[in-house]
Each structure stands twice: as structure tokens, then as C-alpha cells.
Amino acid sequence: MDCSELDSTEKSKPSQLLRAINQIYEEGREESTHSETNAASVEKTMNLLKEKAETGDSQATFLLGQLHYVQGCYAEAELIFDRIKDKDPQALYQLAVIYYDGLGTKEDLGRAVEYMGRVAFWDSSEAGSVRYAALYNLGQAYLEGFGVQASSSEAERLWLLAADNGNPNASVKAQSALGMFYSRPESLDLRKAFFWHSQACGNGSLESQAALGLMYLYGHGVQRDSDSALFCLKEAAERGSVYAQGHLTACYYRRQLYSRAAALGQRVCEYKDTAAIAQQTDCLEEYVRKGIAIGMFYYARCLHLGRGVPQNRDKAKHYCTQAVRIDPLICKELQIDAAHGKI
């Protein structure tokens, strides 16, 4: 379950969370020395939060649980969050994540979805941005049938609530997800897909920026515009979208810019850990793999024909085989194009 849309306090690494806590409770707080170890700093901060929590400071109680959470002490975090879950939507949200992913406890999808639903429809303004994140995750659960009966119509309804008409403070992930949703054969509406990818891109979504590049390139949901397509793909590629890098390699090749195609394709071939890349770029791993397969296939084509690089058919065969292993379906389409002389 995704918690990446929470604010920096909730999703940060231990050192970032420590800094945030110290800024909140900076009064009477001694500055950490450079020689102070991270463990000592964590212990000092935990003691401070415990003192504040004992006086009834609800924020300190949540932050104490969150500090345990980012330290990987999930059992302790669960106990603290459980005590305040009926009053604090952020704590309830984190409990949902713990049960969904089975962090330090047995996986419980039913309870996770129940808690996420309570956050999504929390009857108070206290929920803030965490409500949008919960709506997004709840929609994802309905789309995939995790903890509930699968329902694409319910997923769509929840994502529309989470997207909030393109509100930049709402769930950008939901906006991007709607763009993907309306691009599926089962719920195809390319004009809606273009609208939502545009909203998400404007709000910073890397994945939607890459998708917009392809929509402009092929005229899907919008008039074909090769300049806008290249602009979106180049910028998304520079920001780290492997999917955009793969398609940009293809664009260069088809425009007979073989040296550029070979250089970018070779770079894409160096990517190995798709899960880590997906996490770092906040993009779906499926599309990271597609980007690598496309870039690798076109680099293999450059090597096979000696375009932009010295001809090396053994190396070309190696990369072509690797590309097929990564994404056989997309490579099958590319092989058909190659057989018909389109590549």
C-alpha cells in the first residue's frame, strides 16, 4: 500500500524525521553535536516525545509512533498508533499500511481496507491531505481486489474523489491513476485520459509527463504534436523516467538520429534493479521494465545494423534476448515492426 503522498514528516527517513521533530519542539531543546551518534539522537528525541506525550500532547504521541515506524520497530509503532487511532486519522492510516503490508505483524487486508476507508471518509477536517492518500489507496484496493471484491467502477469513483478536480493539494497519484484507467481497453476514454494526465503532470507527476509525451506522439486524446511529444519525453527522461527514456530512444531511431538513439539505448541497458528505480522515481515498476525493454531492443537494432555504433551482431543478439526476457509482449510487437522493415 502506498504512503508516498503523505507529508514529509510521515514518509521521511529517520534523520529527516528527527530534524522535523526537533524543529517542532525546538524550545528547550539542546542542539545535537556533530559527535553525537544517530542512536543517541534518536534516544534523546524519543525521551522528549515521551515526556510531551505524557502531558497529553497528541502530536507528540503520533510522532513517537512514527519515529518507531521509520526505525523499523513496527510492533512498538502499532501499539502507539492503535491507542490513538480513533482520534488521529494519520495514526489510523499508518495502521492500515502496517496491516496491509504485514509490517511486524500478520498481514490483514480486510482490516487494512476497513481502516483506510475510515480515514477516507473521516468526518472532520483534521484528516487533511491524508484523506486524499487514503482515497487513492482504497481505489487501488478495489481495482485489484485486495481485501475487497474487485470493482473498477468503485475504484474510479474513489479516485475521482481523491483527484479532487485536479487540486494540486489532493492526490496527484489518483490523477495519474485516472489517466491510466481511461487508457485501458475496458474503460477507454482517451480525452479523459489526456485531461487527467495533464492535471497530474502539471502537479508534478513524472509518470503522467511520460504518458503525455506518447499521447502527443500518437495523437491519442489530443491532436498529434511531435514537438510537444519530444518536449514531454525529453523532460521526463531527464527527470528519471525510464519509460520516457525507452520511448525517446525509439523516437531518435525512427528520426534516423542513430548516434543519439544508440547512446541513450546503451544507458538504458545499464539499469538493473527495476524495483529500486520504481521507488526512487515514484513510477510503476511495470513501466520501468517496459522502458528498459524498448531502449534495449532499439540499442540491439543499432548494433545489429551498425547504426550510430560499430556493428556487433553478437552483442545485438545478447541485448535482444535480454529485452525479450524483460517484456516479451512489447518486444514481439517490435520484432514484427523489424520484420516488416519499419525499424
Curated annotation (Swiss-Prot):
InterPro entries: LRP2-binding, Sel1-like, TPR-like_helical_dom_sf. It is found in: Cytoplasm. TPR repeats lie at residues 58-91. It comes from the Eukaryota. Pfam families: Sel1. SMART domains: SEL1 (SM00671). May act as an adapter that regulates LRP2 function. This is LRP2-binding protein.
